[in-house]
């Protein structure tokens, strides 16, 4: 299925220029006010082509621009467009890939202020002024067909207004629509019969009109004849359509079997929990819609106000949605909602006053840059994916194994008089010292501050062989001299390289 695979955001709020690789399930991690929400707003604007306020344009002398590349576009999906639009947009889809660009310089919501273009594959240079064209009609229709719905759940929006009102622009309205669309299809005939019963009672052409309406018709006819002979007047109250009925839907709550009450009476935590419960419902009941289109779900801090157990439930729901027609992007401060499988592709966001919002290299990108052999890449990925805390830390301390992991946090607490999580320090155990250098280089590529804590044998078995230390280093030579001295005292044996080894006679370990 197709995916919004790459997004480039330019001149949008805190973002000067930012390029992101997206997946069907993409976590975004960063400090407060680093620009995570701005990324989501930019993607939402690109998909909905909605209003752009003045504060959304970083530099007023240039347009805000979002460029998105969609991969995996199937012929079947394009065939759902009308024939004219198929012919117009078809040449711009190469090997299932198509790139759109949305830009706007003046703030406002008018459609004429926005320009949506498509990348012309015949022009190789993307910086060429003709690389993106507005000529083919059907560009907006094609993008809307690929992503007909963008659901954006913000962290600090008014959940009361959102959940209590089912409007097409509200989160609850969009969620209810996703959940009820299959219901409408499944029960369409029953609903039509019920509406038909109402229509027969109150419409002007109803065959079972209520007596009071018939009386109104009679009196109206008598009076209208005096002014317009031959004219008949009937009271008409149209029955609601199926869409009218579902459009009015909202949610109410009851507690311990009491009467239903308005959602606004709940606390913020309960309100947020209900929003997330709707997401879980969507993952269970809203997946049977027969459509090749993908929907985009954007969530800020899905863990907000939730109990840790509820966070795990929500995580599973989001995973399930990402495998059933939804592309999910969320910003989080919680390691609980990110699994080991997600660490490699998690987007890490930072911000400076001069350059605005930027991203660090992901674990997967850094591994590929540092380690060229595929089999060794897998080993390094596994090592660094053992702790989701890595994504949230200011500093990492790489250690050789699990023994150090049990001991060092306790020592850190005693020495610093702080818990490791208070200082945003994370200890990452590796399976021995063999991957220490690669792991350190990967973290350096990611621009993550870190230290390596190793046993003494690392100096001889790894550091000297990898060129980190010279064999003639004075400290190395001093230690070898000590080894020889202790050997003469019968404390242990030495191997051919002058390093301690097990004493076979006394069975004393090195």
Per-segment meaning from a language model:
Residues 74-80, 110-114, 160-164, 338-340, ...:
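Switch/connector loops and helix/strand junctions flanking conserved nucleotide-binding motifs
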Residues 351-510:
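Acidic, divalent-metal-binding catalytic cores of TOPRIM
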Residues 1-48, 246, 252-389, 405-406:
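Switch/communication elements of ASCE P-loop NTPase nucleotide-binding domains
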Residues 159-166, 174-299:
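Extended helical coiled-coil dimerization/tether regions that scaffold
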Residues 48-53, 127-143, 234-237, 260, ...:
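Short alpha-helical segments and helix-capping/turn motifs at coil-helix boundaries
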Residues 38, 74-196, 260, 373:
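Glycine-rich phosphate-binding loops of NTPases
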Residues 48-68, 76-81, 284-292, 329, ...:
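Flexible phosphate/Mg2+-sensing switch loops adjacent to catalytic phosphate-binding sites
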Residues 61-66, 96-98, 146-150, 326, ...:
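Short glycine-/polar-rich loops that comprise or flank the Walker A/P-loop
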């Amino acid at each position: 299925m197709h995916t919004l695979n790459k997004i480039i955001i330019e001149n949008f709020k805190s973002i000067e220029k930012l390029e992101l690789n997206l997946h069907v399930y993409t976590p975004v991690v960063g400090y407060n006010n680093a620009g995570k929400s701005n990324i989501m707003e930019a993607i939402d604007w690109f998909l909905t082509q909605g209003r752009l306020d003045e504060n959304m344009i970083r530099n007023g002398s240039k347009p805000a621009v979002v460029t998105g590349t969609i991969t995996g576009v199937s012929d079947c999906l394009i065939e759902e467009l009308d024939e004219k639009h198929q012919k117009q947009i078809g040449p711009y889809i190469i090997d299932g890939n198509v790139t759109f660009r949305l830009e706007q310089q003046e703030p406002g919501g008018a459609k004429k202020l926005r320009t949506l273009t498509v990348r012309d594959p015949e022009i190789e240079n993307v910086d060429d002024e003709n690389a993106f064209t507005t000529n083919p009609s059907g560009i907006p229709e094609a993008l809307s067909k690929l992503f007909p719905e963008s659901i954006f759940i913000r962290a600090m929006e008014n959940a009361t207004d959102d959940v209590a009102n089912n409007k097409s622009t509200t989160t609850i309205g969009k969620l209810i629509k996703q959940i009820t669309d299959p219901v409408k299809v499944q029960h369409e005939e029953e609903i039509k019969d019920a509406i038909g019963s109402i229509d027969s009672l109150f419409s002007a052409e109803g065959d079972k009109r209520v007596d009071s309406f018939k009386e109104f018709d009679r009196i109206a006819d008598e009076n209208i004849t005096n002014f317009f002979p031959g004219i008949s007047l009937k009271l008409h109250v149209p029955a609601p359509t199926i869409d009218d009925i579902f459009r009015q839907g909202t949610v109410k709550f009851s507690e311990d079997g009491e009467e239903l009450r308005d959602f606004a009476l709940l606390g913020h935590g309960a309100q947020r929990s209900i929003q997330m419960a709707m997401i879980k419902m969507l993952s269970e009941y809203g997946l049977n819609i027969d459509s090749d289109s993908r929907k985009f779900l954007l969530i800020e801090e899905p863990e907000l106000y939730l109990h840790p157990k509820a966070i795990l439930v929500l995580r599973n729901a989001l995973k399930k949605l990402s495998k059933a027609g939804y592309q999910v992007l969320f910003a989080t401060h919680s390691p609980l909602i990110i699994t080991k499988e997600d660490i490699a592709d998690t987007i890490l966001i930072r911000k400076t006053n001069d350059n605005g919002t930027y991203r660090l290299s992901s674990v997967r990108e850094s591994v590929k840059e540092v380690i060229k052999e595929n089999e060794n890449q897998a080993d390094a990925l596994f090592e660094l994916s053992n702790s989701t805390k890595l994504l949230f830390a200011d500093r990492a301390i790489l250690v050789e194994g699990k023994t150090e992991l049990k001991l060092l946090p306790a020592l850190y607490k005693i020495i610093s008089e702080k818990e490791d999580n208070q200082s945003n320090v994370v200890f990452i155990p590796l399976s021995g010292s063999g991957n220490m250098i690669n792991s350190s280089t990967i973290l350096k590529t990611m621009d993550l501050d870190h230290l390596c804590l190793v046993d003494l044998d690392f100096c001889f078995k790894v550091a000297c062989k990898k060129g980190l230390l010279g064999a003639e280093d004075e400290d190395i030579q001093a230690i070898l001299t000590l080894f020889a001295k202790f050997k003469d005292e019968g404390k242990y044996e030495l191997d051919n390289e002058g390093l301690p080894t097990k004493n076979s006679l006394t069975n004393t370990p090195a």
